[in-house]
A protein has these predicted regions:
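Structural recognition of the beta-strand scaffold that forms the well-ordered cores
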Residues: 7, 35-39, 73-74, 115-118, ...
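Structured beta-strand-rich core segments of catalytic domains in phosphoester-bond hydrolases
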Residues: 35, 39-114
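Active-site-proximal beta-strand elements of phosphoester/diester hydrolases
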Residues: 2-14, 84-87, 103, 112-123
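His/acidic metal-ligating clusters that form di-metal
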Residues: 103-105, 112-115, 129-162
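Surface-exposed cleft-lining segments at the edges of enzyme active sites
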Residues: 88-94, 117-129, 157-158
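Metal-dependent phosphoester-hydrolase catalytic domains
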Residues: 86-87, 141-148, 155-272
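Catalytic metal-binding/acid-base residues of hydrolase active sites
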Residues: 9-11, 41-42, 120-122, 153-156, ...
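N-terminal, active-site-proximal structural segment of metallo-dependent hydrolase catalytic domains
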Residues: 1-56, 69-71, 256-258, 263-272
Length: 272
């Protein structure tokens, strides 16, 4: 079976926003994905409404318990997948060097087990980001079945000169576990198009797989049409303010990453 998956950093920024905007719920429901991974989620006082709306739309969910910092949420259609297990043992605190990380085991209608991982590499020193990804890969290696990871890697621009953290370092660490990165063209943050071309594109949101085939979609910024006030620059989440000689971004609480998405099938499906 083919499943649609989406990942979205919704920019709750450890509670700096005022809760999840209603249009985010509308967008998630209209995307009609079988699996949803959300990063920079926060357990705001209004989070109960969000979960209730997603449950009404046919989803079940699991969420980290990082207590006061960024969370990861994984949602799945309950008529497509059966929940088997959750691993929320990697807890993020302000004093440790753990990624935002959540893992769930799901079983599809054919009895195929699928492990889904949502993670976000934090904005720490570059060498520490590599260490966080090592934690992710080690957890993924505990599983022998197909694995899907949906990630915000905070990996800098495509051709950064930073040697301790870049896409090549990401790929090298992922390869230790047999994982493959799938990244759309273009940028997932900042402006829709990089001013100086491919080398300066910030493509930080990815699908990562093992024993899964992926039909990758484009980075999706179409949700900006739902709130023109929150997104005054259209599909650009950031712009340069010439009057004050500074860059300005959308307000915290409103997503400032494009949606990453794709369609998945396991190797077992491909052999049928």
């Amino acid at each position: 079976m083919k499943s649609k998956v989406i990942g979205w950093n919704i920019n709750q920024r450890s509670g700096m926003g005022k809760g999840i905007p209603k249009f985010v719920i509308d967008e998630l429901i209209d995307q009609n994905a079988d699996i949803i991974v959300l990063t920079e989620l926060f357990q705001h006082s209004t989070i109960g409404y969000f979960w209730a709306e997603m449950e009404r739309a046919g989803y079940q969910y699991a969420v980290t318990q990082n207590d006061g910092t960024n969370e990861v949420g994984i949602l799945w259609k309950k008529d497509v997948y059966t929940f088997r297990a959750v691993d929320d043992s990697v807890v993020t605190t302000m004093k440790n060097n753990h990624p935002n990380f959540l893992l769930v085991d799901l079983e599809d209608q054919n009895g195929q087990l699928l492990t889904v991982v949502g993670f976000r590499i934090r904005m720490v020193d570059y060498s520490q980001r590599a260490e966080e990804l090592e934690i992710v890969v080690n957890k993924g290696n505990e599983k022998k079945n197909p694995v899907l990871m949906v990630a915000d890697c905070n990996n800098l621009r495509r051709e950064t000169t930073e040697t301790s953290w870049n896409l090549q370092v990401v790929d090298r660490i992922l390869s230790k576990g047999g994982f493959e990165r799938h990244t759309p063209g273009g940028q997932s943050i900042f402006e829709e198009k990089a001013d100086r071309g491919y080398a300066y594109e910030f493509a930080e949101d990815h699908l990562i797989t093992r024993d899964i085939a992926v039909e990758l979609g484009d980075y999706d910024r179409e949700f900006v049409r739902r709130d023109r006030i929150a997104y005054p620059w259209g599909k650009d989440f950031q712009t340069y303010d010439k009057e004050h000689s500074r860059r300005v971004s959308v307000e915290p609480g409103f997503p400032d990453h494009a949606i990453v998405k794709g369609y998945l099938s396991t190797e077992k499906d491909q052999k049928k």
